[in-house]
Amino acid sequence: MSRKLLTLTLLVLMTACANDAPAPLQPMVLDFAKLGKINLAVAHLSYMNNAPRPPTKDVAVFQNYKPQLSDALYRWGVDRLQASGTQGQATLVIHDADLRRDTLPLKTGIDSWFTRQQSERWSGKVTVDLRIEGAASNFAGNASTTVTRSTTLPEDANAAERENAYRRLLRSMMEDLNTQMERAMRDHLNSVILTMP
């Protein structure tokens, strides 16, 4: 009798261990408002997404992660840019918002049996352009930047590892974009910047 009870207990424990899924991650929230508004001497601010559609094979890898890269770029514009003038138009144009997955070659041989190799590279590229037209004194100009980043994933990466890799990639790209766009705006659009933190 005790042998049957022991066997049943072991089966229950094994089943419980097999079904242990990683705890779901909290939704990723990108908040650029804490960085402060960049007030521009224009009356209107708009957003345009001209990014080409990514290859189908890459869409399938990234489509379920939130926020999507183009949504994060839009959020940056809403949180950071403010039209505070009486004339002129500012347009934040997304030219590229691309994420790609590449397979990495794996080593073979006995040594490879005991190491967890990096099997995938996820790469991201963003190009944005802030265009100013018809501002005071008929000022027209633009500030643009391109950001590229990548991260690797180990072989047989689980769902949590993949989600964390996406978050790392997205967060690092957006931090780079913020820094580079601030610099580009100071260099090329200084005459229409009213205030910048």
Where are the model-predicted features located?
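Post-signal peptide N-terminal segment of mature Sec-exported envelope proteins
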Residues: 25-46
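Bacterial signal peptide processing site
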Residues: 18-21
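Surface-exposed short loop/turn segments
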Residues: 88-142
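N-terminal segment of the mature soluble domain
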Residues: 39-103
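C-terminal motif of bacterial Sec signal peptides marking the signal peptidase cleavage site
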Residues: 13-16
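C-terminal/domain-edge helix-coil "capping" segments
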Residues: 157-197
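Short acidic, glycine/tyrosine-flanked loop/strand segments centered on an H-E-D-like triad
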Residues: 43-55, 135-162
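Bacterial N-terminal signal peptides that target proteins for export
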Residues: 1-6
